[in-house]
Each structure stands twice: as C-alpha cells, then as structure tokens.
UniProtKB/Swiss-Prot annotation:
HAMAP family: UreD
Keyword NAD in annotation: no
Name assigned to this protein: Urease accessory protein UreD
Subcellular localization(s) per the UniProt record: Cytoplasm
Pfam families: UreD
C-alpha cells in the first residue's frame, strides 16, 4: 500500500449510491463429483469458476467482491446450500475492507446450509475495519445429519500499515450454528465499540488489534479433541490462543494476535490438523494462499 493509499479517506459521501450485493450458490453431488449447480448474483458479488485441485469430490470456489470494500449503507447477502454428500471449500481472494462510516451501517448476512453427510471448509480472508467503520454482521450455519464443517472469522481493527488504532467505530456481530433439527449448537452476539473497556481488558481483547474464532463442528468435535488442541495453543506477547468444546459436536479456537499474518498462520495450522479428524479428508494449504 502506498503512502497516498494508506492515508486516503475511503468513505463515501452520504448522498452516494449504496451497493447491494447478493449471491446464491448451490452445490449438488453427481456420482462422485461435487458440482456447483446454482449461482445467482445481484450487484458486485461474484463467484469464480469452480476448481478441483483435490479431485472431483471436493469443489473449490472463490467468492469475490469487485469493489473491494464495503461502505455505509452497503448490504451484502450470501446464501449457500451444500446438498447431501457434497464437499465444498469456499474462500475469498483478499481481506474484506469496511470503510469509514458515512452515517449509515454497512451490513453483511451469510446463511450456509450443509446437507446430510456433507462437508464444508469455510475459509475466508479477514475483515479489515477502517477507523470509524460501523458494521453489522450476521452469520448462520445449519448442519444436516452427520454433516461436518470447519470455518473461521478473523478481524483486524484499523489499518496497521497506516498507523490507525481504530479510535472510533462500532461492530455488531451475531453468529450461530444449528443442528439438523434447528436447535442451536452455539450462538454468540457481540457489540464492540471503539471505546469499549473490553478492548484493553485481560478478559477481553487485552489490547490486541487482531482477533478471531475458528469453529469446527461434527461428530469428532468433542472434549478430547479440544484438549489435544489446547495443549499446543500458543500464549505469548504476539499470539494468544485457546481451544474449548462448547457443546458436544462443536470445538472453538479463540485467538488474539498483534498481526493478521500471525493469526492466519495459526488458523491455517489448526485447519491442517483438524481437517483429517473432522472431515476424514487430508489437508493441504490452498493454492490461493500461496499467490
């Protein structure tokens, strides 16, 4: 990022037109192949051509948002359905940038349904909240019978390269995982204000500008798995992490970091360890991450 880019004001005037992006994706199993059979988009959200670096059984898809960032008044809606027996790996090519608010909230809603015996790897790049960004995020994952899923959400407060400390702004977030009968397995609702004392509190963000949650859901996600992960979680001045089984079938890894690169490396290591256990599928770093 150039000096001019890092200090540019990237909010839109209140009178500017807001974006509404909507994307629907549907995956089905045809023989041994997972196929993207449905795609519908409105506005700037798109999906790139599906790839099969692991063979026909696992479909890799990259979700792109061409404008590159989300401003006040913008709304993004993603509805994704994995049919029975499918396996999809979904990611994004870069960080989602949430710009300085123009007086309106920017919103994102993600709803993912994973069919019976299906497998999901939800591996997006991080959210980057500019100073004075106001955002509302909603994430729902529904798991069918004998389904499994691994995913994460990573956040950076302020553009560190530009010296931002996120001195103003607000993030409202809601995440929930539900089982095949619609019963909540895990739910979390948070409202983080730039001046919230929890940002500096030891029981909160402890002064770290980067944080995230990795979740794994499935029959193999039990207390023993969480304990094995917890034993190798780092805890130092640059990266702090812990693992817990919040309910039978759901394991969480919480992480604080001084940089997004450190958090991403940690989440990738966790995913590489978890995938063979949770999905019973070997794990290799995505090619996209290496470009």
């Amino acid at each position: 990022m150039s000096a001019a880019d890092s200090h540019a004001c990237l909010s839109r005037p209140a009178a500017a037109k807001s974006w509404r992006g909507r994307l629907e994706l549907g995956f089905e199993r045809h023989g041994m192949r997972t196929t993207l059979v449905h795609r519908l988009h409105e506005g700037p959200l798109r999906v790139q051509r599906p790839l099969y670096p692991e063979g026909d059984g696992v479909c890799h898809a990259v979700i792109v948002h061409p404008p590159g960032g989300v401003a006040g008044g913008d709304r993004l809606d993603l509805d994704i359905a994995l049919g029975d027996g499918t396996h999809a790996v979904l990611t994004t090519p870069g960080a989602t940038k949430w710009y300085k608010s123009n007086g309106l909230d920017a919103t994102q809603r993600i709803d993912i349904k994973v069919g019976a015996h299906a497998k999901l790897d939800w591996l997006p790049q991080n959210n980057l909240f500019f100073d004075a960004a106001h955002a509302a995020l909603d994430f729902t994952l529904s798991l069918g019978a004998h389904a499994s899923a691994i995913g994460w959400d990573a956040t950076q407060l302020g553009r560190q390269a530009a010296g931002e400390t996120w001195s103003a702004g607000r993030i409202a977030s809601h995440a929930t995982l539900v089982d095949a009968d619609g019963r909540p397995l895990w739910t979390e609702r948070a409202l983080l204000d730039a001046h919230d004392p929890l940002r500096g509190a030891l029981q909160g963000l402890a002064g770290f500008p980067v944080y995230g949650t990795l979740w794994a859901a499935g029959a193999a996600c039990d207390a023993a798995l969480a304990e094995s992960l917890a034993a190798r979680m780092p805890f130092d001045d640059t990266l702090r992490a812990g693992a817990t089984c919040v309910t039978p079938g759901v394991v969480l890894v919480r992480t604080l970091a001084t940089s997004m690169e450190a958090l991403q490396r940690h989440f990738t290591d966790c995913w590489l360890a978890l995938r063979p256990i949770v999905h019973r599928v070997d794990a290799r770093p995505l090619r996209l991450w290496q470009t």
